[in-house]
A protein has these predicted regions:
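Thiamine diphosphate
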Residues: 133-148, 152, 157-162, 175-189, ...
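Feature marks extracellular polysaccharide-active and adherence modules
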Residues: 52, 72-74, 81-82, 91, ...
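Long terminal segments
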Residues: 191-265
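Short, small-residue-biased leader/transition segments that mark boundaries at the very start
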Residues: 1-3
Length: 265
């Protein structure tokens, strides 16, 4: 057997073809050290993998490409860091630094996510059903057709989009009705990209002077419609109803909003 599927923490196959090779391999994380678990994932020849009993192991799917991975449990920090083309689905919550420097692919989280989600993200899509912690989308950046997207179904903590340089951050606030779905100091140091907040409430008073806010028009809603529909399809929501609501957009107010901070020649 090329992958030792029947021993050392690998469960029996759920389904198989004529020669006995299963369509989806299952790996039990349990109390395995993260290095051992990640080695099994990285060397597995199968295109589809299910991870069972995941409990805090770090760096899962780090730099991985070309696979579909389903995670049962709670992965540790830096899930999908440097991800390069995988489809990863977490049936639970995730912790900090999820999607750190993610390059491409899709990460879906059926729960909440911790701090610094999408740190330095430069491509791909992260879909979070629930809330996200502090500093989500910090240092996000885009280049030509590489445009990162972070969609949050609930609300975001403070310092959302800190130093954002590109891409889209979309916070839907589906569980928030009496306040904007964002914490203190959103868009601090923002100099590129866009933040969309679905809300009828006033914006926080501490948006930086270098950042402008306005109500999204139809053209701007059309920009994010594909991402909202992708989110709605994953989590069973009504995309048309979401897009019909009011969105506020945060954008930097010039190509160099921090000119006054530097000495000019």
């Amino acid at each position: 057997d090329v992958y030792k599927r029947q021993i050392d923490g690998v469960l029996p196959p759920r389904s198989g073809d004529a020669d006995g090779r299963e369509q989806t391999v299952r790996i039990v994380a349990g109390d395995k050290h993260f290095r051992e678990l990640n080695e099994e994932i990285n060397t597995c020849p199968d295109a589809e993998i299910e991870l069972d009993n995941v409990c805090g192991q770090r760096y899962i799917c780090s730099g991985l490409s070309g696979k579909k991975v389903t995670i049962h449990g709670i992965p540790g920090n830096a899930l999908c860091c440097y991800l390069d083309g995988c489809d990863v689905e977490v049936l639970g919550n995730a912790q900090d630094a999820t999607g750190d420097t993610m390059n491409s692919g899709t990460l879906t989280i059926h729960g909440h996510c911790g701090d610094a989600t999408g740190y330095a993200m430069r491509g791909g899509t992260i879909l979070i059903e629930g809330n996200v912690g502090y500093r989500a989308g910090i240092h996000m950046k885009a280049y030509q057709t590489h445009i990162p997207v972070l969609v949050v179904g609930g609300e975001a903590g403070s310092f959302l989009g800190e130093y954002q340089a590109g891409g889209y951050i979309i916070v839907l606030g589906l569980n928030t009705h009496d306040h904007a779905p964002v914490g203190r100091f959103p868009a601090a140091g923002m100099h590129g990209g866009k933040i969309f907040l679905r809300t009828d409430c006033d914006m926080p008073f501490d948006i930086p002077a270098q950042v402008l806010s306005h109500e999204a028009d139809d053209a701007e809603k059309a920009e994010i419609a594909p991402f909202v529909r992708q989110f709605a399809e994953k989590f069973g929501k009504d995309a048309d109803a979401i897009l019909a609501d009011r969105f506020v957009v945060l954008v930097p107010d010039s190509a160099n909003p921090y000119r006054s901070m530097y000495v000019t020649n």
